[in-house]
């Protein structure tokens, strides 16, 4: 048979199962056609691909097969093509059937050959079709992605997905050929290439260390290979035309394939050895199951490899070297290595990555046998621990997955402990710079494998300043120095340094040495020779580098701040370091000094003379360390001396070249050594640290002798070892004054040990200082480390009950006995490794201590927790913290917030509430100004003028931000924006570091307030003029806006002062928690996948409707503000175009905020999609969206028809807000099984956190099609509904954020919209909402109002449930049966069963345990479908909230409360008042002993039992709770009653709230007395009954209670009985 003359490509063939069937090369289309037609004769050849691949490659294959068939005139074979939709959704039973139908329709028979052209989905799906069609036909794999090339196409695994999981139905069916055309990768998006590199790295990690080492060094070359274009030239088809990069790429692919092919040949059906290719997949697949399809397979496996490496490290079978190398290699290719990676955190589903969820998914893994999870463990790079997956216990995996950990106190099992610490961070970073600058090769031993050294190495590689390789299994780093030659990175490439301060400071000067390149893409008039861009994370952008930059600029280097003055990021001009005299301020960081010293020998023009100025030099030992290391690398620095021999702070550095020593051993880290030594000290055991002794270069090596020995430890130190033996537990002694200037990083360890030191020496202290004092000085620089460490230690020690005092240069710690420390403390670690490790020392003796951010130790001791367990012998368990927002935050969530606004706007009031709600510190800048200057602002302005005041004000703001970079709210003076310097400072802060909030208030209210205010300086002009001048500046510098409502509109609607104040507090707390992302106000029901609704408001003006909002929102989870329907005239909007003003929308939004705490859905609906907003007004629409972000709106509905760039920009700035990406088709043309809806969904899924697609139902079948579509698209919450009457069924069946209306609304927002009541009724009628039975247990209860309360609530929301009375005074078998019945929905419990019911429950809330009573039973579904019974107490919440809501004045440290009574209700009252934050609680009972006994059960509540109500030890109470029957109290002093006399002095405070727990009569003595006291508000017992019932109702139903209707029913009956 004649064949075409096909140019034979140069191939690499890989054997599998005894056949050379895997052919690898470039540009293979003609070769593939010829080979298939020649070697696989058939009547029909069918090529199947997807639409995405078809665009790039289908035409060339059609041409190749057409030509090949034409060259074979004797053949009658057909060549058919079939194109299917792309993506995982095609890999289904339906997708398989569609291909099979195509084959059958085209009369394909058993001799057909099927070709799969595409990625893994195509290969898996088409392979399974081939395996089953006609009982098996031949097929060919032609993978087009790197992932498919090296993984899914090799080995014969084929499968489809089902709703139960991926690849659950399939077969082993080997392809006849696998053709690997590496030229395909040129058309692959970089992310897809990187996705495949994860599998390549995995294969090398389990099998071949040499290949792994090559991958570590080859990332730039491999990216260059796929970045080149050879498609037009066919370059690479033959070796003669193949570039070096192409050869490398083909080598990488074939080597990876070769390993898998070898393993498959030995174990085709995956009985053991083939499990090895699943390294990273056990955990990776679990992550993928949650995040698919947004996060790719390789990205999930990359995270899985790191985590499974950590599992092996924890089990002691893999060193940190191995984990570090895997992490570095993955990062080199841009793969995520943690679930905290911003790309992962940006996915809404990432909130579902809980430990229990991942462990549950891991149960279903084909590698498992029995309950144990099977994980492939590495023993080193290139070698697995076993030749199969190894069984691992859940607690081991849990500890690795957990973000936090709990240290279990005890005596170290390893006592006496002998260990070494990781390599010194300080020496490791210096050695890397020196070896890179030097000539020759240097082998570094004991290098620290951590985040810090990784970013240093990555930066040096990007600068092409050195080459790195590994020897001895990764124990030795081989550095080939570049002799000081550095190259500008490509344009757009930034050197990202994370929070690595050492790397940032050293590299700042290194980058000045970069060679000039006027042709660089970075060259400009400002930087004619190009520049390097260095940056870091949010905290790094707060850490100072100003003194170093000032010194470099003064020496002629070009350095530019890009955001905040004095901090990264920087543009650093190329061209060299000039040299000569350099003056440097070294009182903040010795790293500035070392940075210049290290680079000075490479000065361009003259020798460097480095002169240190500005006061005492900090951390001199670290400068000495740098000098010693420079000498080792061949350059000796001379430090000048005075005539008397005193050393001066002047250094002469000659111009020279470093000569790399052949080997350099890095000392162990002395700062890290302090932790195990301190564990020995605090637990009374012995620890020896190797490689740290008197000969150490590091100042922290003196910690044991200078601190622990003085505290009472036995210390032995040789040149190379340090041994500490602690005294018996509890016998450490305070040491008075200790100067730690030479070992500043060790101060945190000293602080936690000092916290448990008893009375000792007061050496160096004043005579009146307590003898349990340890005063630590010389550590001021620790305020500008990874966090403000001095403040961090003070704040966290306070949680343990340890008292401290902050000093200018340090702090004092007042030690106390271990047993008196608070237990179960959760320590916030500030993402600071030293904070975490220091508190882990204290945790060894304080039970229940949780370290919230355990991974921050990876900066210097990545395996600290493993070593703490395995080497020291203190157990650590993984803890999952309560979930916080996964949203991408522009800032560190704990970045300090600046408040700006006019004088009189309420900045101080709002700031104080905000700080209290976040648990942060509040600072009024004006008060700080007065404290520092000793003058009132008005006095200062009068004496020195406004200009001087503005300058001083600017400096104070800068100081406050430097001193308080996190967890602080700073309120500024109204005129701060008058200064251009301040405006630049505030704008830069808001762009890069943290929120700047503009507190707004109606201008007329401000004018009225300031007209009567005299304490502050006069403006010298009209206040209104000042306001209108500043107002645009406030908007310019701010990132967010908060409207300070005075409550005028609330008062007009009958709200009490207490309710107005409460609304302000609630909204302030919501706003600041939302914009920080610390506790976003998002719908829990939506997040948890439960049924949820939002109410669509259609009012043109909300203000008149404010009183109706609580009624309208019953049952809703959020409120939709239809911005396009707003109209300041109050007239309904009749149609487009309608563009409401920003100010009007802001006012409406704020009114809504102060009326309801529900999340807001901010919607601007265009005319084409059913609204009134013009489709062409994109600029105006995004101005409104920006307003929503500035006001902290929770959900923003964004139509995907707007321009993609605008949407992407909005998404990048959304913070904790979520985007509902929406599309509405009013025509009815969109079909739920068509291509258009898939296209719209894919677009919406890419940009939105929630997807909303609305169609129009023309028949009832359209609802079923929608249902099927929704079932297949579950990666994100999906709102899918059909409009019109025929579409109402879709609203009933939709579960996520169904838009609902209410009968009281003026119009419905869309045709067919239903109420919550309508939907519940329909669900019940369709069998989707089963009726449940609820009960009240207790006796006597015949006249209880609870049935009326709850049954009214069920009726109003259309719920088919019933609430019954079950009268009983004992727990009977019938009660036991009722609460375990399938229809049991929940129960209220009253006397006498509140305690007796507890043994029947599976779990009891902490508050119910503390109160000692359960009044509510809530059934909860477990993961396995069974039911657990949860008991809680809602009485305390009712007391808490009604007291809080009626307090006019906020709670301060001086606020007091009074509880009358000492029974069970009094316990709930005490718990509620303590939860309010009131620190002094008076307790009165007729029997004082009973009061004292009750007080003793709550020793931390600040309870003071009273003998009389006539006077109070402190301030009079502003909250009074009466837990005494009404008959037991009287206001008649001369009464013969045995009741408690209530004197008028009870209510002597000017305002307050009294809560009466007695149900009858309506007006009790205490309420009557309060009614006579101006400013006091009374809460009746019936109000408490209703309030606690609302919480029960919402806990049982998951729906917001229709409070107004429920309460109206109860009050009506109650009043009729009086």
UniProtKB/Swiss-Prot annotation:
Enzyme Commission number: 4.2.3.4, 2.5.1.19, 2.7.1.71, 4.2.1.10
Subcellular localization(s) per the UniProt record: Cytoplasm
Keyword Kinase: yes
CDD domains the UniProt entry points to: DHQase_I, DHQS, EPSP_synthase, NAD_bind_Shikimate_DH, SK
Reactions this protein catalyses: 7-phospho-2-dehydro-3-deoxy-D-arabino-heptonate = 3-dehydroquinate + phosphate; 3-dehydroquinate = 3-dehydroshikimate + H2O; shikimate + NADP(+) = 3-dehydroshikimate + NADPH + H(+); shikimate + ATP = 3-phosphoshikimate + ADP + H(+)
Source taxon at top rank: Eukaryota
Pathway: Metabolic intermediate biosynthesis; chorismate biosynthesis; chorismate from D-erythrose 4-phosphate and phosphoenolpyruvate: step 2/7; Metabolic intermediate biosynthesis; chorismate biosynthesis; chorismate from D-erythrose 4-phosphate and phosphoenolpyruvate: step 3/7; Metabolic intermediate biosynthesis; chorismate biosynthesis; chorismate from D-erythrose 4-phosphate and phosphoenolpyruvate: step 4/7; Metabolic intermediate biosynthesis; chorismate biosynthesis; chorismate from D-erythrose 4-phosphate and phosphoenolpyruvate: step 5/7
Binding-site residues, Zn(2+): 199, 281, 297
Cellular component terms per the entry's GO annotation: cytoplasm
Gene Ontology BP annotations: amino acid biosynthetic process; aromatic amino acid family biosynthetic process; chorismate biosynthetic process
Required co-factors: Zn(2+)
Residue segments, region Shikimate dehydrogenase: 1331-1618
Co-factor binding details: Binds 2 Zn(2+) ions per subunit.
A GO MF label: shikimate kinase activity
Region spans: 3-dehydroquinase: 1097-1318
Keywords: Amino-acid biosynthesis, Aromatic amino acid biosynthesis, ATP-binding, Cytoplasm, Kinase, Lyase, Metal-binding, Multifunctional enzyme, NADP, Nucleotide-binding, Oxidoreductase, Transferase, Zinc
Region: Shikimate kinase, residue numbers: 894-1096
Glycoprotein listed as a keyword: no
Region (EPSP synthase): 407-874
InterPro entries: Aldolase_TIM (IPR013785), Aminoacid_DH-like_N_sf (IPR046346), DHQ_synth_AroB (IPR016037), DHQS/DOIS_N (IPR030960), DHQS_C (IPR056179), DHquinase_I (IPR001381), Enolpyruvate_Tfrase_dom (IPR001986), Enolpyruvate_Tfrase_sf (IPR036968)
Binding locations of 7-phospho-2-dehydro-3-deoxy-D-arabino-heptonate: 135, 151, 157, 167, 199-202, 260, 274-278, 281, 297, 366
Name of the protein in its database record: Pentafunctional AROM polypeptide
Organism of derivation: Thanatephorus cucumeris (Black scurf of potato)
């Amino acid at each position: 048979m004649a064949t075409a003359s096909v140019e034979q490509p140069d191939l690499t063939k890989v054997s599998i199962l005894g056949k050379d069937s895997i052919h690898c090369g470039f540009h293979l289309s003609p070769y593939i056609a010829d080979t298939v037609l020649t070697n696989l004769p058939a009547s029909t050849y069918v090529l199947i691909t997807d639409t995405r691949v078809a665009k790039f490659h289908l035409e060339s294959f059609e041409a190749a097969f057409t030509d090949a068939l034409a060259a074979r005139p004797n053949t009658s074979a057909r060549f058919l093509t079939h194109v299917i939709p792309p993506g995982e959704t095609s890999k289904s039973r339906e997708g398989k059937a569609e291909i099979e139908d195509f084959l059958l329709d085209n009369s394909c028979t058993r001799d057909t050959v099927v070709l799969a052209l595409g990625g893994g989905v195509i290969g898996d799906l088409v392979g399974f079709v081939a395996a089953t069609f006609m009982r098996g036909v031949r097929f060919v794999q032609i993978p087009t992605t790197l992932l498919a090339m090296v993984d899914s196409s090799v080995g014969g695994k084929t499968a489809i997905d089902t709703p139960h999981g991926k690849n659950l139905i399939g077969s082993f069916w080997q392809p006849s050929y696998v053709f690997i055309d590496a030229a395909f990768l040129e058309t692959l998006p970089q992310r897809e290439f990187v996705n495949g590199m994860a599998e390549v790295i995995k294969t090398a990690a389990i099998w071949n260390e040499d290949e792994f080492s090559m991958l570590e060094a080859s990332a730039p070359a491999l990216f260059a290979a796929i970045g080149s274009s050879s498609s037009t030239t066919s370059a690479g088809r033959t070796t003669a035309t193949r570039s070096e990069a192409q050869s490398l790429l083909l080598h990488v692919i074939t080597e990876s394939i070769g390993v898998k092919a070898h393993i498959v040949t030995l174990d085709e059906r995956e009985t053991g050895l083939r499990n090895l290719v699943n390294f990273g997949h056990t955990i990776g697949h679990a992550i993928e199951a949650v995040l698919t399809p947004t996060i790719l397979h390789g990205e999930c496996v990359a995270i899985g490899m790191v985590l499974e490496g950590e599992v092996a490290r924890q089990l002691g079978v893999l060193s940190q070297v191995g984990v570090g190398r895997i992490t570095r290699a993955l990062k080199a290719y841009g793969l995520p290595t943690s679930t905290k990676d911003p790309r992962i955190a940006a996915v809404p589903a990432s909130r579902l990555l809980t430990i229990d969820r991942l462990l549950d998914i891991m149960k279903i893994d084909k590698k498992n046998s029995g309950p144990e999870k099977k994980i492939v463990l590495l023993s080193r790079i290139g070698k697995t621990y076993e030749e199969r997956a190894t069984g691992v216990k859940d607690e081991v995996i849990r500890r690795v997955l957990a973000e936090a950990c709990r240290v279990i106190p005890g005596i170290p099992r390893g006592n006496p402990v002998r260990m070494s610490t990781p390599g010194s961070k300080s020496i490791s970073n210096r050695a890397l710079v020196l070896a890179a600058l030097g000539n020759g090769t240097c082998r570094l031993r004991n290098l620290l494998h951590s985040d810090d050294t990784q970013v240093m190495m990555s930066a040096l590689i990007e600068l092409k300043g050195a080459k790195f390789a590994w020897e001895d299994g990764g124990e030795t780093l081989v550095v080939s120095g570049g002799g000081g030659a550095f190259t500008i990175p490509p344009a757009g490439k930034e050197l990202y340094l994370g929070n690595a301060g050492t790397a940032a400071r050293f590299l700042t000067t290194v980058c000045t040495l970069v060679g000039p390149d006027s042709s660089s893409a970075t060259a400009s008039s400002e930087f004619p020779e190009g520049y390097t861009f260095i940056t870091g994370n949010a905290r790094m952008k707060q850490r100072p580098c100003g003194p170093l930059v000032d010194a470099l600029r003064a020496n002629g280097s070009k350095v530019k701040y890009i955001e905040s003055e004095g901090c990264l990021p920087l543009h650093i001009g190329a061209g060299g370091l000039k040299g000569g005299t350099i003056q440097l301020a070294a009182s903040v960081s010795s790293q500035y000094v070392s940075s210049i010293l290290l680079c000075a020998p490479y000065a361009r023009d003259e020798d460097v003379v480095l002169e240190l100025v500005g006061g005492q030099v900090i951390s001199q030992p670290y400068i000495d360390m740098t000098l010693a290391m420079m000498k080792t690398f061949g350059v000796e620095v001379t430090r000048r001396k005075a005539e008397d021999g005193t050393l001066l702070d002047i250094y002469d550095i000659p111009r020279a070249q470093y000569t790399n020593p052949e080997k350099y051993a890095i000392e162990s880290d002395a700062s890290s050594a302090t932790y195990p030594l301190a564990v020995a000290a605090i637990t009374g055991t012995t620890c020896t640290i190797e490689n740290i002794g008197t000969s150490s270069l590091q100042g922290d090596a003196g910690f044991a002798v200078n601190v622990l020995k003085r505290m009472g430890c036995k210390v032995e130190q040789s040149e190379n070892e340090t041994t500490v033996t602690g005294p018996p537990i509890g016998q450490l002694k305070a040491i008075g004054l200790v100067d730690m200037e030479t070992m500043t990083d060790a101060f945190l360890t000293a602080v936690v040990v000092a916290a448990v030191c008893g009375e000792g020496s007061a050496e160096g202290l004043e005579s009146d200082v307590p003898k349990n004092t340890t005063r630590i000085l010389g550590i001021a620089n620790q305020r500008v480390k990874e966090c403000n460490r001095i403040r961090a230690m003070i704040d966290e020690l306070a949680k343990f009950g340890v008292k401290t005092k902050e000093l200018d240069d340090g702090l004092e710690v007042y030690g106390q006995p271990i047993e008196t420390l608070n237990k179960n403390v959760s320590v916030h670690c500030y993402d600071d490794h030293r904070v975490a490790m220091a508190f882990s020392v204290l945790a060894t003796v304080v039970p229940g201590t949780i370290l919230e951010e355990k991974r921050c130790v990876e900066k210097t001791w990545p395996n600290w927790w493993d070593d703490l367990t395995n080497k020291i012998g203190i157990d650590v368990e993984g803890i999952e913290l309560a979930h916080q927002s996964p949203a991408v935050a522009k800032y560190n969530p704990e970045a300090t917030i600046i408040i700006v606004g006019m004088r009189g706007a309420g900045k101080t009031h709002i700031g104080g509430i905000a700080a209290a709600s976040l648990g942060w510190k509040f600072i009024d800048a004006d008060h700080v100004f007065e404290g520092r200057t000793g003058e009132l602002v008005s006095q200062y302005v009068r004496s020195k003028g406004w200009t001087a005041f503005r300058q001083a004000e600017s400096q104070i703001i800068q100081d406050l931000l430097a001193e308080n970079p996190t967890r602080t709210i700073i309120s500024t003076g109204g005129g701060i924006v008058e200064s251009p310097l301040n405006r630049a400072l505030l704008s830069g802060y808001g762009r890069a570091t943290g929120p700047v909030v503009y507190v707004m208030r109606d201008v007329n209210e401000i004018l009225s307030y300031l007209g009567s205010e005299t304490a502050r300086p006069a403006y010298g002009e009209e206040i209104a003029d000042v306001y209108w001048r500043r107002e645009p500046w406030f908007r310019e510098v701010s990132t967010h806006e908060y409207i300070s409502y005075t409550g005028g509109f609330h008062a007009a609607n009958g709200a009490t002062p207490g309710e107005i104040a409460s609304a302000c507090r609630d909204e302030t707390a919501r706003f600041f928690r939302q914009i920080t992302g610390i506790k976003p106000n998002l719908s829990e029901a939506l997040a948890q996948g439960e049924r949820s609704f939002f109410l669509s408001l259609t009012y043109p003006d909300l203000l008149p409707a404010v009183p109706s909002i609580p009624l309208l929102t019953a049952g809703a989870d959020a409120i939709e503000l239809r911005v396009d329907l707003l109209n300041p005239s109050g007239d309904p909007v009749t149609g487009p175009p309608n563009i409401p003003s920003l100010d009007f929308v802001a006012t409406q939004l704020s009114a809504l905020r102060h009326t309801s705490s529900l999340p807001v859905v901010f919607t601007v609906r265009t005319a084409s999609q059913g609204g009134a907003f013009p489709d062409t007004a994109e600029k105006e629409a995004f101005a409104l969206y920006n307003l929503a972000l500035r006001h902290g709106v929770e959900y923003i509905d964004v139509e995907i028809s707007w321009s993609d760039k605008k949407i992407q920009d909005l998404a990048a700035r959304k913070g904790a807000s979520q985007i509902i990406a929406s599309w509405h088709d009013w025509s009815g043309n969109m079909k739920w099984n068509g291509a258009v809806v898939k296209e719209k969904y894919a677009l919406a899924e890419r940009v939105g956190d929630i997807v909303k697609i609305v169609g129009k139902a023309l028949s009832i079948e359209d609802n079923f099609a929608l249902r099927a579509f929704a079932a297949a698209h579950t990666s994100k919450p999906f709102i899918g509904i059909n409009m019109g009457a025929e579409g109402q069924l879709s609203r009933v069946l939709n579960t996520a954020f169904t838009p609902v209306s209410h009968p009281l609304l003026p119009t419905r927002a869309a045709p067919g919209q239903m109420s919550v009541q309508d939907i519940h009724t329909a669900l019940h009628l369709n069998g989707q909402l089963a009726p449940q039975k609820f009960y009240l247990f207790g006796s006597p209860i015949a006249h209880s109002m609870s049935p009326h309360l709850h049954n009214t609530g069920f009726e109003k929301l259309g719920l088919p449930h019933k609430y019954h009375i079950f009268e009983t005074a004992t727990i009977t078998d019938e009660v036991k049966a009722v609460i375990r019945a399938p229809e049991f929905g929940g129960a209220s419990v009253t006397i006498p069963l509140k305690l007796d019911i507890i043994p029947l429950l599976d779990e009891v809330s902490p508050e119910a345990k503390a109160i000692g009573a359960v009044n509510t039973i809530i059934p909860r579904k477990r993961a396995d479908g069974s039911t657990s019974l949860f008991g809680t107490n809602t009485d305390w919440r009712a007391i808490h909230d009604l007291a809080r809501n009626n307090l006019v004045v906020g709670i301060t440290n001086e606020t007091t409360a009074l509880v009358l009574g000492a029974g069970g209700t009094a316990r709930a009252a005490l718990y509620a008042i303590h939860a309010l934050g009131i620190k002094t609680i008076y307790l009165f009972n007729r029997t004082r002993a009973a009061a004292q006994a009750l007080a003793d059960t709550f020793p931390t509540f600040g309870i003071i039992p009273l003998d009389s109500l006539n006077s109070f030890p402190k301030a009079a109470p502003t909250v009074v709770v009466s837990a005494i029957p009404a008959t037991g109290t009287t206001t008649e002093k001369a009464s013969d009653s045995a009741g408690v006399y209530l004197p008028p002095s009870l209510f002597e405070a000017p305002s307050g709230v009294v809560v009466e727990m007695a149900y009858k009569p309506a007006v009790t003595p205490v309420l009557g007395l309060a009614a006579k006291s101006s400013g006091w508000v009374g809460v009746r017992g019936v109000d408490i009954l209703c309030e606690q019932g609302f919480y029960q109702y919402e806990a049982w139903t998951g729906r917001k209670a229709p409070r107004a209707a429920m309460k109206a029913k109860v009050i009506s009956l109650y009043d009729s009985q009086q």
